[in-house]
Amino acid sequence: CRYYFREDGIMAAGPTEIDGQIHYFTPKGIEVVLVNGLNPVPDWYAPNLVTLTGDHQVDQLCYDALVKMLDDCAAAGIEYEFNSGYRTLYTQTAILEYRTREHMESYSLNFRDARDKALETVAVPGTSEHHLGLAVDLLGKEAIPWFTEHCWDYGFILRYTQEKEDITGIIDEPWHFRYVGTKVSLDMKDSGLCLEEYLGAEPVTSGKVHALFGEKLYEETIYGKEEQK
């Protein structure tokens, strides 16, 4: 856990500027990296990736807790599918471009309208929690309810719910879990707050996201022409 004390000696809580960049701290002063449509992955952040299985990677920070959670789920006789962990900028861009083309063909939309529709369900590259290596997508008819109930005990939170769509800017994703550590997850469990609320961050709206990124949202090649790493 990282704590930060301001010049007046008071421990930081909520959004706090440090060396010209905004950092987010819980009400108890623990720093949590916030990534959403208004907060791209910070320049200073670099995931320490380890391989979980196959070509799936996660940050080492959550590896042990994730393995324990998955093992306990399996021990309970519940089958799950590990769908996604860390994503490169390249991969996120490919997903966005695929969805855009799909909407153009399925709904006979022009590129801009199709991109807007794609952005309703796909995060702008650079603003996905999957870039952190701390978010995982876990599937399974019986597994999702199990993870939803027990994730908190392993340091994970259910990140996106229907009730909080107007705050997170993301539709209901019952499969998406974010690692924040047990000190934070257990404190959040019964709070009814999403991460933005808990950290005192402003709500994410499509209007604010468009204002932040502008025409970059409609440039077909702006994000994803780097080589995949």
Enumerate the predicted regions with their spans.
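Extracellular adhesion/carbohydrate-binding repeat motifs centered on closely spaced tryptophans
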Residues: 1-31, 64, 149
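Extracellular modular ligand-binding repeats in secreted and cell-surface proteins
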Residues: 5, 25, 60-63, 217, ...
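Catalytic cores and adjacent binding grooves of peptidoglycan-active enzymes
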Residues: 28, 68, 109-229
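Conserved oxyanion/phosphate-binding beta-strand-loop segments in alpha/beta enzyme cores
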Residues: 30-44
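Active-site acidic/histidine clusters and adjacent loop/turn architecture
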Residues: 48-87
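Mid-length scaffold segments of soluble, non-membrane domains
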Residues: 80-81, 85-92, 127-131
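Charged, often glycine-rich, active-site loop that binds/positions anionic groups
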Residues: 92-104
